Every structure is written in structure tokens, then in C-alpha cells.
Amino acid sequence: LFVASIDTHTLHALNAKTGRKVWSYTTGGRIDSPPTYYKGLILFGSADGYVYALRAGDGILAWRFRAAPVDRRMMAWEQLESAWPVHGSVLIQKNVLYCTAGRNMYVEGGIRFLRLDPATGKLLGETVMNDKDPETGEDMHLAYLKKTQGNNMPVAHSDILTCDGRNIWMRSQKISLDGKRLEIGLEKVEEQNPKDFHIFCQNGFLDDSYFFRSYWTFGRRVTGGY
């Protein structure tokens, strides 16, 4: 079993039968969610801005990649971490590792959407998702008002990535396998393609706020309200 101890920045490997610790590895920041197993490697991100690959058998570091554009730190929830943290759970799809670095598209230059070789850590591609419409180059808020109606805003917060086999999803934001944001504007409910239905949470899969009720949704997206 591979378990992340979030606030101690440590990943533990446990014997599934006895619970005995086999090895542990400590990073420079929080590990906010479980790691990903892939062909003998344990792959995960950390709030220190790096992606790690450990050998599953002994916890030895195979490679480490800095997903953050620069190694700059800040205080967050009483701990030091990167201005561009990486979620613990990374996505593997068609032998490519996908992850994001950053908190929000509107701060610190946006979110970095990265594609890595999971075996070597080699960078295969990077897309910066920021406050500009990728289709027109306009300010996203102004461009979005032209594409939709009502009190709605595009997805901007980072979250654990999911995949339906055809596209990648960050909350309800559709992203192509080569890192392009797709279908920025809203669609009419009756015209939404059922093939795009997926499980997401509008507040993020990692939201642990006690006083805010959030639900996992199976669909294409949700709209805002007043």
C-alpha cells in the first residue's frame, strides 16, 4: 500500500498484509492525494512544485522533475510551498504522465499543464493556461461574456485531472491530450454531448471544507447562479 501523509510531506509504502512500513520518502511540500502506480514506479506530485518517480520496491528516487517554472516559495496554510504546487495524484494516459502546476489561471502567470515521459521524466510538452482566451487572445472574462450568458465564469482553479479515454478533464474544463483547452463557452443542456459526461466536483475533488456542501456530478458542466 502507498499512503501519503499530507502535512509531513511523506509517502509511505506499507506491507498490505501486516501494515509494516517498508520504506518512506519525504519531499519538500505537502502531498495532497494518493500517488499513481505505473510499471514499477510510484509517481506523484508535491506542493514543492516537483513531480517525483520512486521505485516501488525500495523507494529509491528514479527521477524528479520541476513542474514549477521557477523554484519560488511562499507560505500557505502555515507551511512553505511552491507558488505552483502539483497535486499528488498524477494522470497516466497512453503512456504519458499528465499533471498541472499552479493554483489558478488568474494568478502567478496561470497553470502549467505538463506532459512527461513517466519512465524518464522527460518533458514532452507544456501549455500555459492563463487569463487569456486561447481561441482569441482576449481577456478571458470579456471573451467568456461574449460566449455565454448569465452569471458564469470559466474553470480557473486547478484540480486532480481525470480522463474519459478521449479527453482530459480539470473539473468541467475539457482539455485535449495535447494540452489544448476546448469548448470554453457554455453549451445548452439539451445540446450537451453524452460522450463528454464525466465525474467531477465543481469545488474540486480535494475540497475538505466542512461548512460547504459540494457534490460529485456526472455530466458535462454546471452553471452559476445568483
Give short role names for the model-derived ranges.
Residues 1-226:
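Noncatalytic, solvent-exposed loop/strand surfaces
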